[in-house]
Amino acid sequence: MNIMKMMKQVQQMQAGLAAAQEKLASQTVTTEGAGGKLKVTATCDGNLTELVIDPSIIDPSDSEFLQELLLQTINAAIAKGKETAAAEMKKLTGGLDLPPGMGF
């Protein structure tokens, strides 16, 4: 394979990855907990953008319950975002399993 052609392909892939990163920074995923009474929205690059808590699940005498629900739902949103990001990157890299940190 011609080295110039290979370099051009690498540049195209880098441009595609940069565009995908921008897209993922604005693409959101939402998860729900507590039977829909807790909703967390996050970008696919891991930033939380919305947290909705139904007042009916707030019990001042049992704050640990709410803390646990929040952690579970936030972690689920982050995991869902990572899965979405990984699927998008896999499309761009043609299924190559690149190590973490390689351009993302």
UniProtKB/Swiss-Prot annotation:
Subcellular location: Cytoplasm, Nucleoid
Annotated InterPro entries: YbaB-like_sf, YbaB/EbfC
One Gene Ontology molecular-function label: DNA binding
Any one GO CC term of the record: cytosol
Keywords for this protein: Cytoplasm, DNA-binding
Classification via Pfam families: YbaB_DNA_bd
Main subcellular localisation: cytoplasm
Function according to Swiss-Prot or TrEMBL: Binds to DNA and alters its conformation. May be involved in regulation of gene expression, nucleoid organization and DNA protection.
Name of the protein: Nucleoid-associated protein Amuc_1227
Organism: Akkermansia muciniphila (strain ATCC BAA-835 / DSM 22959 / JCM 33894 / BCRC 81048 / CCUG 64013 / CIP 107961 / Muc)
